[in-house]
């Protein structure tokens, strides 16, 4: 039976890729022998079972039209176990599809060093905590540290399930090369993933996603983080930490996350159309109550627009919107200090019954003395039963302006500042709120089993994946290939 399946796979693959080969692999030794010698168009199918891959280093390269594919025969049926790391050094156009990583303590599941056009898709990731002080970065995208330039870029991490990270270290890191002049990975995409559980809380270095690092913060990364679900990601005050320029974080759902999406370093970033749901969650950390926050901003020329925030429980560092003071002026310095918020536009957002909607000028016990500059709070809708706006220090129009905002106050709600009719319109009834039900990310539209509309093109590893001949997509739990207008399963069975 196994031979027949192998023959069927071989015939199908040859019809799609010409001279490319396909191999069905059954043991870790077969995998470690076959993958380093991969050629463009090769497909490696891992049969159901356990694979101890240990420390596997790959430098093979596919092409745009003939990527190298490493995939499970059945979705999540091939399990990678024990300790190890897949290092992709100067590799290109490789796709890892449908694997189950259930490993003991290790430094990383994947480490991309100068790799480009790598796709990590529809996998599940879990790691045990085996020792005190354990740290890991589950997926690290960048280059060899001392290189002068960064060759990494155009990688995609999508439709994965990341479960219960319980050790130290950030989960996904977009990094780069740290030589002279150095550089950051560019045009990477993190989308349609589920991040479920990241705890316990620590003071620093446990972000769920981090884009950049202080010494590369003036580099433009152009990373897009979109359509992800973050649930109970409490490990770091910054759930998503942006530490570079020209990135976009959009259409994500944050549920019960004790922290914020933080534009921590860099300029010209965008946080758009995200959903933040606090659901009443709080906790105690270092004898202080912490809550679920929204977006905290440092640096200049950022846009925060179209976000929906409901029931958020954070304040001070973690209100719905935090524009704290800074301890440094904006410059091209790569200092790890907190640049003051400057020319930040907060517009078109909806805030519903958050403990604290907007806080401006928090000084961190007088450590941050530089006030926000030329920020705007415009066209926002607020429903509040507490004080909506908190000014920690006196502000003028040179610091922040307000215009065309609407607010409905219930219970003990107040605006929290003196205002004019052009700044806030006080509503007499509950306004119509944006419909968010179809925008919330769930297991049905994210993660390994998340659906994709097969008739809608999806920007992917090779540009646009469609149902054209030879293209592969996911449908009803199966890997599907289209040939001659007819759909086939991976093993060549007509659907």
Regions found by a protein language model. Give the residues of each.
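Right-handed parallel beta-helix/beta-spiral solenoid domain characteristic of secreted/periplasmic
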Residues: 23-29, 45-54, 58-109, 119, ...
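Boundary at the C-terminal end of the N-terminal hydrophobic targeting segment
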Residues: 18-22
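Bacterial N-terminal signal peptides that target proteins for export
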Residues: 1-8
């Amino acid at each position: 039976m196994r031979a027949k399946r192998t023959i069927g796979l071989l015939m199908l693959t040859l019809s799609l890729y010409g001279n490319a080969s396909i191999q069905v692999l059954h043991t870790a030794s077969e995998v470690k022998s076959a993958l380093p010698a991969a050629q463009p168009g090769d497909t490696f199918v891992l049969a159901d079972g356990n694979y101890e891959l240990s420390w596997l280093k790959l430098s093979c390269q596919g092409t745009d039209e003939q990527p190298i594919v490493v995939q499970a025969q059945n979705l999540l049926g091939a399990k990678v176990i024990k300790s190890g790391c897949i290092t992709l050094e100067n590799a290109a156009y490789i796709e890892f599809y449908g694997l189950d990583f259930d490993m003991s303590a290790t430094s990383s599941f994947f480490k991309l060093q100068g790799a480009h056009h790598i796709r990590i898709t529809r996998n599940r990731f879990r790691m045990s905590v085996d020792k005190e002080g354990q740290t890991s970065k589950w997926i690290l995208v960048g280059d060899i540290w001392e290189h002068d330039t960064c060759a990494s870029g155009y990688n995609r991490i999508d439709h994965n399930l990341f479960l219960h990270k319980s050790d130290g270290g950030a989960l996904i890191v977009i990094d780069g090369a740290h030589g002279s002049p150095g550089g950051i990975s560019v045009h990477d995409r993190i989308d349609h993933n589920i991040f479920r559980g990241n705890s316990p809380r620590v003071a620093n270095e446990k972000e769920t996603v981090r884009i950049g690092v202080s010494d590369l913060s003036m580099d433009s990364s152009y990373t897009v983080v979109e359509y992800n679900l973050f649930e109970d990601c409490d490990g770091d005050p910054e759930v998503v930490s942006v530490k570079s320029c020209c990135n976009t974080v959009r259409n994500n759902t944050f549920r019960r996350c004790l922290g914020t999406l933080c534009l921590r370093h860099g300029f010209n970033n965008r946080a758009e159309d995200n959903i933040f749901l606090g659901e009443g969650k709080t906790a105690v950390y270092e004898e202080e109550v912490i809550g679920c926050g929204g977006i905290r901003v440092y640096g200049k020329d950022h846009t925060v627009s179209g976000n929906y925030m409901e029931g958020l429980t954070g304040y001070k560092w973690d209100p719905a919107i935090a524009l704290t003071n800074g301890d440094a002026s904006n410059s091209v310095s790569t200092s790890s200090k907190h640049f003051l918020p400057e020319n930040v536009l907060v517009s078109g957002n909806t805030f519903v019954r958050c403990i604290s909607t907007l806080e401006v000028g928090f000084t961190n016990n007088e450590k941050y003395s530089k006030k926000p500059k030329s920020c705007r709070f415009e066209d926002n809708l607020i429903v509040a039963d507490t004080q909506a706006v908190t000014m920690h220090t006196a502000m003028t129009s040179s610091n922040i302006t307000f215009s065309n905002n609407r607010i409905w106050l219930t219970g003990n709600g107040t605006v929290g500042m003196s205002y004019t009719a052009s700044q806030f319109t006080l509503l007499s009834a509950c306004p119509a709120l944006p419909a968010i039900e179809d925008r919330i990310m769930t297991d049905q539209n994210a993660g390994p089993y998340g659906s994709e509309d097969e008739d809608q093109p999806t920007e992917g590893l090779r540009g646009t994946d469609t149902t054209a001949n030879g293209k592969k997509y996911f449908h009803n739990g199966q890997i599907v290939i289209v040939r001659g207008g007819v759909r086939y399963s991976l093993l060549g069975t007509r659907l």
